[in-house]
Amino acid sequence: MQKKITIYTDGACSGNPGKGGWGAMLMYGDAVRELSGYSPATTNNRMELTAAIEALRALKEPCSVALYSDSSYVVNAFREGWLDRWTRNNWKTAAKKNVENTDLWKQILELTARHTVTFHKVKGHSDNPYNNRCDELARQAIQKKP
């Protein structure tokens, strides 16, 4: 039986593009692990994706994951079937343009294949303490830098 893991993620950018940070919280029972990172030149969408990628990468065995993000970009790609269409169309959008951030989408597809993942949309900058903490981790990463 797979462990049930709850993940919250967020990405932030100072300028878009600009310096970026990401934050994630992984929760299993009473255990909480916080992750964060920095990129000197990126976009908000890349940081949102990176947060989810790094959180899933931190799991050492196949898990049942509920992943919460305030990014419609990340959540809708899975829930609305965007990724299925993009892969079928050789990474082209419906308008026949190249899908942005293909490198990251390929990574997250590989990681989600290892786990049972459900994506959930949360309202950003609201009263969700876990989303707010991830936002704080992402913003702190921008300030700290490596």
Curated annotation (Swiss-Prot):
Cellular compartment(s): Cytoplasm
Tell me the cofactor note. Binds 1 Mg(2+) ion per subunit. May bind a second metal ion at a regulatory site, or after substrate binding.
| GO terms classed as biological process | DNA replication, removal of RNA primer
Q: Which reaction is recorded as catalysed by this protein?
A: Endonucleolytic cleavage to 5'-phosphomonoester
Give the superkingdom in one word: Bacteria
SUPFAM superfamilies registered for this protein in UniProt: Ribonuclease H-like
The terms under GO molecular function for this entry are: magnesium ion binding; nucleic acid binding; RNA-DNA hybrid ribonuclease activity
The record ties this protein, via InterPro entries, to: RNase_H, RNaseH-like_sf, RNaseH_domain, RNaseH_sf, RNaseHI
> Can you tell me which residues bind Mg(2+) 1?
10, 48, 70
Q: Name one GO cellular component term.
A: cytoplasm
Which prosthetic group or cofactor does it need?
Mg(2+)
Q: Does the keyword Signal apply?
A: no
One Pfam short name: RNase_H
Q: Where does this protein hold Mg(2+) 2?
A: 10, 135
Q: What is its EC number?
A: 3.1.26.4
Q: Where is the RNase H type-1 domain?
A: 1-143
What NCBIfam families would the database entry show? PRK00203.1
Q: State the function annotated in the UniProt record.
A: Endonuclease that specifically degrades the RNA of RNA-DNA hybrids.
Listed PANTHER family: RIBONUCLEASE H1 (PTHR10642:SF26)
Q: Which HAMAP family match?
A: RNase_H (MF_00042)
What family, per the record?
A: Belongs to the RNase H family.
Quaternary structure, per UniProt, is: Monomer.
**Protein name per Swiss-Prot or TrEMBL:** Ribonuclease H
- UniProt source species: Chlorobium luteolum (strain DSM 273 / BCRC 81028 / 2530) (Pelodictyon luteolum)
